[in-house]
From Swiss-Prot:
Keywords: DNA-binding, Methyltransferase, Restriction system, S-adenosyl-L-methionine, Transferase. It comes from the Bacteria. This is Type II methyltransferase M.HpaII. InterPro entries: C5-MTase, C5_DNA_meth_AS, C5_MeTfrase, SAM-dependent_MTases_sf. Its EC number is 2.1.1.37. One of its GO terms (molecular function) is DNA binding. The keyword Chaperone does not apply. Pfam families: DNA_methylase. The gene is hpaIIM.
Length: 358
């Protein structure tokens, strides 16, 4: 397995403009091992490698995400983690399990909400891997909506399994916002961490927000952006009419222009994710329509953010390779984790495990 710590990928900050750099202590490098489940394009991996970890297993079923992952880390993730043949490749021992698993309801039907009640969901596979391998710690990430999903029953079941069935110390989950950790994106996610009873850990504090606020101007493309990212006058007119219709009904849905000194909305897949993060950039010099622009290029400087800007919103370094189409890149970064927020929390986990690596 190629180790990214051996090349230049992570020799620069974890994000082009973030406050998170690889740990300077050379003795920390590869001081712990971790596995990367539902790996996507490797946001968790970058964060944990920045902290000195070595990834010894990864899984991701989406072929386009696998392509991006391999281009950046040199190894192809295993596929469907629900399959026993995939689980068989997981090394017996590793220190930390990382997973950004999807939110799914459980068919509890009045049961106690235990391990077997989660069968058939992707969380079941995460829990089963924890049960089999007994890592020292785990770090799970999910959408903020998990907190109230199914009237809170989903999260309650997850915590019950982790605490009661698996015997881990699991502090109350925290809602962590990426904007507080060096990236200009209002992205709230729920973090769940846990520690094996053998570690003796019985308390945990999530990281405090940083003082520094980063805005879109800090991550804007340095060079003139290609014309293809600019909207047509016709499409802008459609967006404005669409927004007016919704506002007349009392809805807040619609396109939004992020000012240079502003913070982006959470980047998401679908649901006008790109249109909710439009920007004004007057550096355009070529107003010749491209194949994906129907009609005239607008003269107001309104454009979509580029995939590289979305990468920066998530805290990916500029050396991170984007080998896929724009459409795939938007999807991949929209589904990814915010690297600096993951890294800040990962550092807190390692501080608790610190005595194990002295």
């Amino acid at each position: 397995m190629k180790d990214v710590l051996d090349d230049n990928l992570l020799e620069e900050p974890a994000a082009q403009y973030s406050l998170f750099e690889p740990e300077s202590n050379p003795n920390l490098r590869e001081k712990f091992t971790f596995i990367d489940l539902f790996a996507g394009i490797g946001g968790f991996r970058i964060a944990m490698q920045n902290l000195g970890g070595k990834c010894i297993f990864s899984s991701e079923w989406d072929e386009q995400a696998q392509k991006t992952y391999e281009a950046n880390f040199g190894d192809l993730p295993y596929g469907d983690i629900t399959l026993e043949e995939t689980k068989a490749f997981i090394p017996e021992k590793f220190d930390i399990l990382c997973a950004g698993f999807p939110c799914q309801a459980f068919s509890i039907a009045g049961k106690r909400g235990g391990f077997e009640d989660t069968r058939g969901t992707l969380f079941f596979d995460v829990a089963e891997i924890i049960r089999r391998h007994q890592p020292k710690a785990f770090f799970l990430e999910n959408v903020k909506g998990l907190k109230n999903h199914d009237k809170g029953r989903t999260l309650k079941t997850i915590l019950n399994v982790l605490r009661e069935d698996l015997g881990y110390f699991v502090p109350e989950p925290a809602i962590v916002n990426a904007k507080n950790f060096g990236v200009p994106q209002n992205r709230e996610r729920i973090y769940i961490v846990g520690f094996h009873k053998s570690t003796g850990v019985n308390s945990f504090s999530y990281p405090e927000p940083l003082d520094k606020i980063v805005t879109f101007a800090d991550i804007r493309e340095e060079k003139t952006v290609p014309t293809k990212y600019y909207l047509s006058t016709q499409y802008i007119d459609t967006l404005r009419k669409h927004k007016e219709r919704h506002e007349s009904k009392g809805n807040g849905f619609g396109y939004e222009i992020i000012p240079d000194d502003g913070i982006a909305n959470a980047i998401v897949v679908g649901g006008m994710g790109r249109e909710r993060n439009l920007v004004i950039d007057h550096r355009i010099t070529d107003f010749t329509p491209t194949t994906n622009i129907k009609g005239e290029v607008n003269r107001e400087g309104i454009r979509k953010m580029t995939p590289r800007e979305w990468a920066r919103l998530q805290g990916f370094p500029d050396s991170y390779v984007i080998p896929v189409s724009d459409a795939s890149a938007y999807k991949q970064f929209g589904n990814s984790v915010a690297v600096p927020a993951i890294q800040a929390t990962g550092k807190k986990i390692l501080e608790k495990l610190g005595n194990l690596y002295d």
